[in-house]
């Protein structure tokens, strides 16, 4: 398993080959916060051993950026190893997390703060995108944004069966509002990126949203949508995006012509 890489002051990233997912550790004078716990107990145990090798302190909390299995199934392993530490997530994410994970019990609707003494972590739910319950973690003093799967580097954004294609661009616009030209952005999957990368990905997602909205509004059948436009992503990345997007477009009921 790979070691941690320090990408900013006391912010370490462990990029795990399984699903190319990132586990992040943020340190402060009161301890460490782990963001996302990987896809299995075995992966979580390996991460715990690597955290010990950092020699940076004890884990005092866990954060789940959303509810997908590759980000939460190590929750129980971390909680057991560190004597019942709290797991934080949005209310939406916790409600959708596999009970076996187990789900976060410290939840919030819009924003929360974890105080590590000499630094604070801001947990913010900006809106729907990859899921209904995505959050980002901002570390202001280090100018770092942990974006979860709202941003992906090693593959196109995962527009899955529980995504919100028409909402995602606006949510990512809000995330960009939390960054500067120097911000280090850690995606849910892949290597660390910068603000420009996120801007480009947001533009691609906006193209997807606008194209779906245009096709649906013009009455193009959902089954014909993929072949009826140019898209920024390959077909297999849009398999769920098109039906999900079509379902979000309001339908105007047909009316009889006036005479």
Task: Give the location of each predicted region.
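Active-site neighborhood of phospho(di)ester-bond hydrolases with catalytic His/Asp-centered motifs
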Residues: 35-37, 58-68, 88-92, 126, ...
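Active-site HxH/HxHxD metal-binding segment of metal-dependent hydrolases
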Residues: 45, 49-115
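Conserved beta-strand hairpin/beta-sheet module of binuclear metal-dependent hydrolase folds
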Residues: 2-50, 135-148
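Solvent-exposed loop/turn segments at secondary-structure junctions
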Residues: 19-20, 39-41, 67-71, 93-96, ...
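Divalent metal-coordination and catalytic microenvironments
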Residues: 10, 26, 36, 51, ...
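Metallo-beta-lactamase
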Residues: 6, 31-33, 39-41, 92-207, ...
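Accessory terminal helices/loops
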Residues: 177, 192-259
């Amino acid at each position: 398993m790979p070691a941690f890489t320090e990408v900013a002051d006391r912010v370490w990233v462990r990029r795990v080959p399984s699903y190319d997912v990132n586990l992040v550790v943020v340190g402060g004078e009161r301890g460490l916060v782990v963001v996302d716990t990987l896809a299995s107990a075995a992966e979580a145990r390996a991460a715990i051993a690597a955290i010990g090798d950092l020699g940076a302190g004890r884990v005092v909390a866990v954060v789940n950026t959303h509810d997908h299995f590759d980000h939460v199934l190590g929750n129980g392993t971390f909680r057991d190893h560190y004597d019942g530490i709290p797991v934080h997530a949005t209310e939406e994410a916790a409600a959708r997390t596999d009970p076996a994970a187990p789900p976060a019990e410290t939840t919030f609707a819009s924003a929360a703060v974890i105080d590590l003494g000499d630094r604070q972590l801001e947990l913010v739910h900006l809106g729907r995108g990859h899921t209904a319950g995505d959050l980002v973690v901002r570390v202001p003093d280090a100018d770092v944004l942990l974006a979860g799967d709202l941003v992906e580097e090693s593959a196109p954004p995962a527009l899955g069966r529980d995504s919100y294609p028409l909402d995602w661009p606006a949510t990512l616009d809000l995330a960009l509002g939390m960054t500067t030209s120097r911000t280090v952005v850690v995606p849910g999957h892949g290597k660390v990126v910068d603000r420009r990368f996120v801007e480009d990905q947001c533009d691609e997602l906006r193209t997807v949203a606008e194209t779906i909205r245009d096709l649906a509004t013009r009455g193009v059948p959902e089954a014909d949508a993929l072949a009826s436009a140019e898209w920024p992503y390959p077909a297999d990345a849009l398999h769920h995006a098109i039906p999900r997007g079509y379902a979000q477009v309001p339908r105007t009921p047909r009316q009889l012509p006036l005479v």
